[in-house]
Amino acid sequence: ITEFPLKAQVLPEGAIWEFDSYEDLCSFDADFFLNVDSRIVDNICRVVGCERSAITGVSPIKEGISNLSFLFTVDGEGFVYRHPGSGTNEVVNREAESYSLGVAKELGLDHTFLYEDTVEGWKISRYIPGCRSFDYGDGEQVRVALGLARSLHQSGKTSPWSYEPFEESEGLVALLKEAGYPLPENFSTLSADIRKLSYLSSLEDGKKVLCHNDFYGPNLLVHDGGMELIDWEYSAMSDYACDIGNFVAQGSGYSVDEAINILPL
């Protein structure tokens, strides 16, 4: 193609309206939220127990990696609605997640959970204002975080589902190949090394316990009232070392000695 002609249709001022936020749209059409056909709005009303008119302050949350989430307010109380990202239901067992969320709430590890639809994968949680990013360099925060993990591992709670990190990773690779995604250079060599390490670690496997399996900084909400362990999408029975390994490997920046020093905590 050497040419790509474009034609423009010039419209008069005021013919097209641009809205930067939900509030802008509602200012233009006060009845929009009351009349819009949205299962998401219906889900909120059913779980929270409110009328559509009570839902205000809708704003997107940009921190999510794989899901689409937004914040909203009902009668002055904040909530978060999570809509599962495209393809996430292929890699996340929503029944296992919902089960573990119930356990986490019972154990006092996550006070935010309200409801999850195990078929569609959407979830509603309470919003905790004033949360701070977890600091791997703060000894007290590290102590509290590892205490949450220990409480889970030693709770005696079990799950009908299990999670094997290497097997799960192989499943993800298969999905990527099926979708035609290019794998990194020398991936086969790295995969072989990981397979060998997985085998060696399996020789020392102890009793499986209920684990979070995504235990690292972004999933630890630090606030004035304590700390919450959120995002239980991969939680199931596993080797407790999986949680410790995640905590160290995903962004801690620890040296080998620093990683060893946190183990007694």
Task: Give, region by region, the residue ranges found by the protein language model.
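Active-site activation/catalytic loop segments of kinase-like enzymes and analogous catalytic loops
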Residues: 241-265
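Helix-rich C-terminal or lid/interface subdomains of diverse kinases
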Residues: 21, 143, 264-265
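A short, conserved alpha-helix in the catalytic core of glycosyltransferases
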Residues: 1-4, 152, 221
